[in-house]
Amino acid sequence: MDYWLPIIVLFGAFFFMLALGVPIVYAIGLSTLASISTQLDFNSALSVVSQKLASGLDSFTLLAIPFFILSGNIMNHGGIARRLINFARILGGRLPGSLAHCNILANMLFGAISGSAVASAAAMGGVMHPQQVKEGYDPAFSTAVNVASAPTGLLIPPSNTLIVYSLVSGGTSIAALFLAGYVPGILLGLALMVIAGIIAVRRGYPKPERPTLRQAGVAIWMAIPSIFLIILIMGGVLSGIFTPTEASAIAVISTLFLALVLYREISVKDLPKIFLESVITTAIVLLLIGSSMGMSWAMSNADVPFLILDLLNTISDNPIIILLIINIILLIIGTFMDMTPAVLIFTPIFLPVVTELGMDPIHFGIVMVLNMCIGICTPPVGSVLFVGCSVSKLPINKIIKPMLPFYAVMVLVLAMVTYIPQISMALPRALGY
């Protein structure tokens, strides 16, 4: 019983406080303190928690997060979303359900630049939903398309979630994680487009008129600076010209230039509000990271990963079954916990387990983030689901049924990425990671 006491206290206190509605940062910190106090005296436990809080934030890599958050907020206010939508409409062409395809492609592009699924759902839903309804699309279907596709950009770099995973996994290469996310992210987007197209054909949704050559040229020309930004950031990181942290600073400078000078969608007077939004978001994320470092130490000190591995081995010694169980657990976790805290808390638990099975940490990072992408679209706590419904002004219960085909295809892609490592590992290995 003494051996299990720190673990029981840690998770018992954590989930009890979550059930009471205690903010997750406090739930993590207090449950960690209580768990460590079962092994050390209170003052020593308090010292460990405070040291881990400070050391967890003492990382040059972490500087990328506030810069990418600021860059995303500038994009959200700077008219970039509208230009990406116009570009996506050209790519969608006259396919059945073209506006749904446009929504998915625009979310992939905007999410890849901003790194925020919530921002993508809000920005794209605000523009695309009224257009789709006007063209005769079912409002619930339109919302489901927006919600399901918003997280695709979290796999397509740059991604704050992959940066967080790199930190908590012990320094997995960020460039390798960025490379590994491309194919799964694009595969997920294409799979969603297939489902949207099938539904559009069955329901007889109209095809848009073919754009004139001039309209296509203008849309592509106006989107080139935003597309070039993705190429600049990723090309610089992968070529070694600059680090991910330096890339994030370049992203801020570039988006400021686009929004203030080129597109002129915001003025200098709008910047304090954007900076304040970014500071608040950054503070929340960094508090979560710092407090989670103490929890990770408490779990490692109590040998939680090895206990989990022993438990899974008693169920089955088949890696396929063990990975299936881990995916099911992560999917359940994703339904009630936001992405960043879930990655911070459960990576230290499951990463040692999967590495024992021979799974590459880069591969597992993509699997974990893909699980969380599904989770944030799922009730009861899915943040993207709530934002998507608030934008379209529809209750969540109206969206669940239209979401079911998209959930199915997302789980199918998850299974493919889990059991076919080449999907995520081909690019990193080809470039020497």
Predicted regions and their residues:
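Alpha-helical transmembrane segments of multi-pass membrane transport proteins
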Residues: 1-433
